[in-house]
A protein has these predicted regions:
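N-terminal prepro-regions of secreted/extracellular proteins
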Residues: 1-40
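Residue-level signal for mature regions of secreted extracellular proteins and peptides
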Residues: 3-6, 61-63, 123-124
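Low-complexity, intrinsically disordered short peptide segments enriched in small/polar/basic residues
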Residues: 14-20, 28, 47, 106, ...
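A structural detector for beta-sheet-dominated domains
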Residues: 24, 51-55, 63-65, 69-71, ...
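Intrinsic disorder/low-complexity segments enriched in polar/charged and small flexible residues
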Residues: 37, 116, 122, 151-154
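Membrane-insertion modules used to breach or fuse lipid bilayers
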Residues: 44-105
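Membrane pore-forming effector domains from diverse proteins
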Residues: 88-140
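Short, low-complexity, Pro/Ser/Thr/Gly-rich segments in the mature regions of secreted, periplasmic
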Residues: 141-156
Length: 156
């Protein structure tokens, strides 16, 4: 019986690659605060002024398929997208904002963070250690230190 030589291309003896994460896409995304007193609607027409003093936390989300570490994904996002990204931010809202509303329109204001929506993937060695394979994917909506009011109008 003869053994396959070490240079046999049908064998892969490489070391297993430690699983790692990659950010596969990003876009700007408004992460709204979800506590009472930070979302307003007024109209039709005129102007709206909001003033609020509130403390709370704006929290991001990480979702996906397969096994993954939200902390590792957030750490990767901090190094490849923006150092100001975090899982959550504790904030104190305390300012006044005024905006004109278009005729026959309703104005909406929502406080939150100008953050990012990310796509991510987790990679690892294939079972035969010949290839790198994607083992998990998902999305994350993460806040940054940039906070403020988002304004939009609707017909009703």
């Amino acid at each position: 019986m003869t053994e396959a030589p070490h240079n046999d291309p049908s064998r892969c003896d490489g070391p297993a690659i430690k699983p790692y994460y990659g950010i596969t896409g990003k876009s700007s995304y408004f992460v709204p605060s979800l506590w009472n007193g930070t979302e307003y609607k007024d109209g039709p027409g005129g102007s709206m002024t909001v003033s609020v003093t509130k403390t709370g936390t704006i929290t991001g989300t990480v979702t996906g398929s397969g096994e993954f570490s939200a902390g590792a994904i957030i750490a990767k996002a901090k190094t490849t997208v923006s150092v100001s990204i975090a899982a959550s931010f504790a904030i104190a809202v305390g300012h006044t904002y005024t905006h004109d509303i278009g005729k026959k329109k309703y104005g909406h204001l929502q406080y939150g963070s100008w953050g990012y929506k990310l796509s991510w993937a987790k990679y690892a060695s294939s079972a035969d250690r010949c290839h790198i394979v994607k083992v998990s994917t998902g999305t994350a909506k993460l806040p940054t230190k940039s906070m403020g009011w988002k304004y939009w109008e609707t017909a009703s």
